[in-house]
Regions:
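A structural boundary/capping signal
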Residues: 1-133
Length: 133
């Protein structure tokens, strides 16, 4: 991969978000005004493709303690967490403590299309071979 800055990668990822790359569970809440909504899983996987590191996951809770869902982001080395989608959450949603998640050998069917859509857009914008690991 040609040398890229994290700032450049972040800009490209954010510009590539769309309803097509949104988690199906969040599609009804996705909008250009909240483009990060439902992008955390796809974004974390694409950043992991590009930069390696750990995948982090945490439950997201409503004020009554019930679970809204899960949130995913990245850690690169000790103390450097990158969460491009944290702003997606409403004030009533709280991200809990994270744990490291092993990357699945294959992306699950539920979000595979969304991940591939984001990966294709990001790799094209960065002029990378979409078939590279």
């Amino acid at each position: 991969m040609p040398a890229r800055t994290l700032e450049e990668i972040e800009r490209v990822v954010r510009a590539s978000w769309s309803v097509e790359s949104c988690d199906p569970a969040d599609a009804a809440n996705w909008s250009p005004e909240n483009p990060a909504r439902g992008q955390c899983g796809s974004t974390a996987l694409v950043l992991n493709d590009l930069l390696g590191g750990d995948l982090l996951t945490a439950e997201v809770h409503y004020p009554d303690g019930s679970r809204q869902g899960y949130h995913h982001w990245n850690r690169f080395g000790p103390g450097l967490e990158v969460d491009l989608t944290l702003e997606q959450f409403f004030a009533t949603e709280t991200v809990q403590e994270p744990r490291v998640m092993a990357r699945p050998p294959q992306v699950g069917e539920r979000v595979r299309e969304q991940y591939l859509a984001l990966r294709k857009a990001v790799y094209a914008a960065l002029e990378l071979d979409p078939n590279s690991p």
